[in-house]
């Protein structure tokens, strides 16, 4: 998605459990096929009851598989914990009520290049990558 599309799509405040939490637009990333969208953005959790559980708001209009997790179209929040120098545990929750969806492992990306707070790459043959800093995990568009 280009900057104008992101501005029209990313909410200033994301609906997270019983709160409306401010988003950090400069960290937003998303993709679209012109009809459906997948996007994510860092949320500013200071002063909320996040307890470090979540740091990002994520919305998909289509069914996805992220790592081994299946996500229906909808709104999610996720956070991560560093397991070691090579891996993060990324945990997804439903944004509406904080219900745990599950966790996956993100691994260090070895390719050189820019590092983003969040980057959702467009898919090739229905597969793409989501980057959190220099860590990455795969997603697959499901029909």
PLM regions: where:
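Mid-length scaffold segments of soluble, non-membrane domains
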Residues: 46-97
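Primarily secretory-pathway and cell-envelope proteins
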Residues: 1-49, 98-143
């Amino acid at each position: 998605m280009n900057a104008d599309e992101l501005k029209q799509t990313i909410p200033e405040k994301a609906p997270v459990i019983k709160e409306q939490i401010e988003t950090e637009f400069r960290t937003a990333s998303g993709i679209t096929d012109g009809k459906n969208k997948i996007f994510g953005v860092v949320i500013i959790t200071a002063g909320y009851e996040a307890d470090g559980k979540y740091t990002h708001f994520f919305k998909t209009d289509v069914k996805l598989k992220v790592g081994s997790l299946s996500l229906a179209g909808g709104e999610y929040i996720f956070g991560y914990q560093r397991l070691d120098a090579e891996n993060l545990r990324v945990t997804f929750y439903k944004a509406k009520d904080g219900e745990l969806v599950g966790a996956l492992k993100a691994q260090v990306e070895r390719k050189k290049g820019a590092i983003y707070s969040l980057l959702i790459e467009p898919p090739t043959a229905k597969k793409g990558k989501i980057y959190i800093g220099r860590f990455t995990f795969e997603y697959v568009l499901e029909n």
